[in-house]
């Protein structure tokens, strides 16, 4: 069994309790034993970031960008190694892991290039002897708290713009996937990033995370995770002595609407890919299917035909879906399945544990799910799809919007009027037309509405860079 103990020992230097990083496809496979960070360890990491800020912020932006570009090249060269580690640590298929690694090294290159064009603007003055211009400057030390489901790309899409802008960082990945960020820090170091610019800490969010975001040395917090934790972080930041910028990317309960004008074969493909790809463990995953009554029966048949071909197993094999990430999430998924059975939803596919050494679960589909059921309203974060019938487009839009979340939403249709109506009325930060609800491009801004985000600062694209910069206005007279 492959061990990553050397990687852990080199980059994760906590002094707290021991944590076992386990392969979710094989519970007997320990990837590494990791020492979690204590509050004192976190304070030390923050102090290192503070001490390094002046040097790094004064490093010319093109030089900072060159380091990111180099890191992207190195990651590309080591892509296979990154992908294997991701599959072993998080559980996703090698194909999905390689896709994420590719996006990650392209993100490094994207923000490396953007560092060359950080600039302010010049404005006209009413006084002929005055020049007005603005200057963009880094914020200071930023705290980045990242989830386990995209254990490389989300850390990169936070860290790369933060570094390009000239900030130093304390980054806390999820305890389920710390090795991916350790590998990222290693690549940045090889690319020439000075020690202390990025400081990795690993530990429980209730202790380590709270310590980071509450520290008055932290100028900004970027968090991706559950809405519950996001709201708590929002309050912690608000109670600090220092005003702190905050960026939140939170939970989702995304719907795909199948219109009566839809290509039903395409719709079934998008539903299965969006609902069961990545084991349903994505904030943009399809969790709800809203089906126009005129095509309900035909679509259901296509859906069941497609899901029967969906292959589940270890991500290192030729499969479509890997294991659930760990025992806690596995139990949560099973609890929702039992709930669905008990409240009157009809289980039409799956719902069973797949025997083996990992946390394997069949893709699961319920129909007859009503808007008052928890299956309809709550984020599950697993391979569980709920199906609800809508009498027309108006009711479908009402159902899509009838949750507290607004990350992504999709429509499958050929009727342009229906498409435009859906796009204009649905409350979500990303709308997909004849595309799966999952899948984002790095050059486009991303962020959810309602309880899926703070709707203040977007991630990815050029927008993300602005979160990590402040603007100074200068009036220069003579």
Curated annotation (Swiss-Prot):
Keywords: Arabinose catabolism, Carbohydrate metabolism, NADP, Oxidoreductase. NADP(+) binds at residues 148-149, 172-175, 225-226, 379. It comes from Saccharolobus solfataricus (strain ATCC 35092 / DSM 1617 / JCM 11322 / P2) (Sulfolobus solfataricus). The keyword Oxidoreductase applies. GO terms for molecular function: 2,5-dioxovalerate dehydrogenase (NADP+) activity. This is 2,5-dioxopentanoate dehydrogenase. 2,5-dioxopentanoate dehydrogenase involved in the degradation of pentoses such as D-arabinose or D-xylose, a major component of hemicelluloses such as xylan. Catalyzes the fifth reaction in the pentose utilization pathway through dehydratation of 2,5-dioxopentanoate into 2-oxoglutarate. Also shows dehydrogenase activity toward glycolaldehyde and DL-glyceraldehyde. It catalyses: 2,5-dioxopentanoate + NADP(+) + H2O = 2-oxoglutarate + NADPH + 2 H(+). The keyword Transcription regulation does not apply. SUPFAM superfamilies: ALDH-like (SSF53720). Induction: Expression is highly induced during growth on D-arabinose. The promoter contains the conserved cis-regulatory element 5'-AACATGTT-3' ARA-box found in arabinose-induced genes. GO terms for biological process: arabinose catabolic process. Belongs to the aldehyde dehydrogenase family.
């Amino acid at each position: 069994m492959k061990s990553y103990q050397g990687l852990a020992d080199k980059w994760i230097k906590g002094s707290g309790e021991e944590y076992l990083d386990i392969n979710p496809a094989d519970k007997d496979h320990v990837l590494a034993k990791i020492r979690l960070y204590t509050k004192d360890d976190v304070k030390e990491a923050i102090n290192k970031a503070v001490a390094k800020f002046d040097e790094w912020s004064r490093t010319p932006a093109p030089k900072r960008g060159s380091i990111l570009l180099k890191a992207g090249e190195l990651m590309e060269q080591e892509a296979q190694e990154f992908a294997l580690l991701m599959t072993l640590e998080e559980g996703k298929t090698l194909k999905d892991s390689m896709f994420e690694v590719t996006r990650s090294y392209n993100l490094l290159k994207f923000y490396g290039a953007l560092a060359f064009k950080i600039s302010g603007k010049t404005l006209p003055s009413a006084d002929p002897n005055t020049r007005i211009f603005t200057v963009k400057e880094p914020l200071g030390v930023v705290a980045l708290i990242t989830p386990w489901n995209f254990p490389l790309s989300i850390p990169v899409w936070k860290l790369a713009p933060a570094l390009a802008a000239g900030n130093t960082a304390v980054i806390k990945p999820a305890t389920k996937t710390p090795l991916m960020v350790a590998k990222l820090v290693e690549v940045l170091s090889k690319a020439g990033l000075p020690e202390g610019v990025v400081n990795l800490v690993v530990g429980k969010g209730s202790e380590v995370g709270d310590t980071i975001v509450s520290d008055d040395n932290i100028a900004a917090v970027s968090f991706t995770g559950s809405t519950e934790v996001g709201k708590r972080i929002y309050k912690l930041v608000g109670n600090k002595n220092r005003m702190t910028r905050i960026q939140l990317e939170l939970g989702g309960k995304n719907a795909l609407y199948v219109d009566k004008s839809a290509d039903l074969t395409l719709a079934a493909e998008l539903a299965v890919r969006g609902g069961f790809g990545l084991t349903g463990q994505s904030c943009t995953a399809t969790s709800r299917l809203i089906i126009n009554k005129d095509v309900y029966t035909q679509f259901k048949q296509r859906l069941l035909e497609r899901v029967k071909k969906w292959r589940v197993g270890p991500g290192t094999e030729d499969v479509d879906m890997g294991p659930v990430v760990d025992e806690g999430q596995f139990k949560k998924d099973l609890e929702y399945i039992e709930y669905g059975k008990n409240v009157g939803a009809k289980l039409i596919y799956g719902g069973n544990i797949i025997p083996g050494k990992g946390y394997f679960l069949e893709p699961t589909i319920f129909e007859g799910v009503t808007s008052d059921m928890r299956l309809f309203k709550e984020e599950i974060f697993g391979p569980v799809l709920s199906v609800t019938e809508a009498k027309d487009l108006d009711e479908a839009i009402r159902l899509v919007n009838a949750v507290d979340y607004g990350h992504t939403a999709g429509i499958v249709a050929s009727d342009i009027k229906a498409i435009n109506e859906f796009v204009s009325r649905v409350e979500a930060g990303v709308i997909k037309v004849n595309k799966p609800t999952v899948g984002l491009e790095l050059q486009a801004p991303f962020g959810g509405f309602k309880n899926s985000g703070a709707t203040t600062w977007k991630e990815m694209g050029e927008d993300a860079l602005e979160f990590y910069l402040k603007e100074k206005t200068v009036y220069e007279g003579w």
